[in-house]
Amino acid sequence: MGKYEDMLIEHDYIEVIECDNLPKRLSGLWLGDMILINRNLPITSKLETLAEELAHNELTYGSIVDQSNFNHRKFEGYARRLAYEKLVPLKDIVKAFLQGIHNLYELANFFEVTESFVLQSITHYKRKFGHSTRYGKYVIQFEPLRVFEYKDIWILHIKGGGLLKNI
């Protein structure tokens, strides 16, 4: 079972219907207690759409379909960023690198999303944290994407009476 199916099971209190009659510009639509998802999307795009529509459930209220309204675009952005953080979390970026995953194609397969979604997630994290961030004992650098284990380095300060000093 993949992440899309897992997410459907986790949120089984919400009816998710895959349909053919959504407008071309919409991959999914939140309708209060129901989510419609375009049936013709690949499974990776369905997962991305489901995560974003679930984020709308958490963050927004009412209809925000009219994207000419500034506040509607703002709420759309909030939901998209939450979807990035749910589907490509920092802890799993570390996990992927520890498993030897080092290129975009492998990362997209690891997260079960499109390569474009991985790139958008990394861009989101760069905007949120800057060039890099710490996660536990790791440093995640966003461009180029790399993960390093962070270690404190202690040196012996001989002249000062043999004290250990953290640098």
Regions found by a protein language model. Name each.
Residues 1-167:
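Active-site hotspot residues in diverse enzymes, especially metal/ion-binding acidic/histidine motifs
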